[in-house]
Amino acid sequence: MESTLQAEAPSKRRGGEFAAVPLHADEVRSALKTVIDPEMGLNIVDLGLVYDIEVNGGDVEVQMTLTSPGCPMGPYILSESKAAVESIDGVVHAEIILVWEPFWTSDRIDTRVRSLMGL
């Protein structure tokens, strides 16, 4: 289940000044679409690796998985995911939680992308 909670968070911009900036799970999802799985050549959202996004003020928690427990690019993908979320104006803290249930299968790939891939 995905959170669409809107919260007020301090802005990290404007040279230390703070301003209320509403954060949305959709903004987090958009930022995560910039993270590409190097082995698959697709972003982690369209791959279906992002399971849940929770926004609470300036804190963001993302539950995600990898294509396999032995994914050699796992540390890179997790690090890039955290950096992408932390780059959003208003995010103070990002936590990326790696989960293995439900286990990822190619059925989780976005239907539009699956169609383009011929799956």
What residue spans do the PLM features occupy?
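Domain-level signature for proteins that mediate thiol-based redox and metal-cofactor handling
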Residues: 1-119
